[in-house]
Amino acid sequence: MATLQCRVVSAREEIYAGEISMLIATGSEGEVGILAGHTPLITLLKPGSMRIQTPDGNEEVIYVSGGVLEVQPKLVTVLADTAVRAHDLDEAKIVEARKKAEQMLANQTETLQTNAALASLAESVAQLQTIRKYRNRA
């Protein structure tokens, strides 16, 4: 199978660099799969899991909180706001953050608080979905 190079970079660090056979992520228009030879593309990423398949058949699952996906003829670059390998996500902390966001929504008094709570809730849900996808593959 044909391959291409991939780099996943967050504001803090490079999460992944290497050869891949496929990448699947959630873009602004829905789920997108990238294989070697894909047409050039730039799209915004939505919060959620991103799957990287390596040429040897292994799969990496990475949570991204948003960012940009750029596809060039031989290179895929992901510039993520936040990127964390699924096995590094702390489920207990995420569940606690989700509960806190739900409580904030229940006790809302201002639109700004509502927006912050909704954003926090969406991030927690996306992280939990990433953990579940990772567990199903492990």
Swiss-Prot record:
It comes from the Bacteria. It is found in: Cell inner membrane. Pfam families: ATP-synt_DE_N. GO terms for cellular component: plasma membrane; proton-transporting ATP synthase complex. It is a peripheral membrane protein. InterPro entries: ATP_F1_dsu/esu_C_sf, ATP_synth_F1_dsu/esu, ATP_synth_F1_dsu/esu_N, ATPsynth_dsu/esu_N. One of its GO terms (molecular function) is proton-transporting ATP synthase activity, rotational mechanism. Its main location: membrane. Keywords: ATP synthesis, Cell inner membrane, Cell membrane, CF(1), Hydrogen ion transport, Ion transport, Membrane, Transport. Belongs to the ATPase epsilon chain family. Produces ATP from ADP in the presence of a proton gradient across the membrane. F-type ATPases have 2 components, CF(1) - the catalytic core - and CF(0) - the membrane proton channel. CF(1) has five subunits: alpha(3), beta(3), gamma(1), delta(1), epsilon(1). CF(0) has three main subunits: a, b and c. This is ATP synthase epsilon chain. It comes from Psychrobacter sp. (strain PRwf-1).
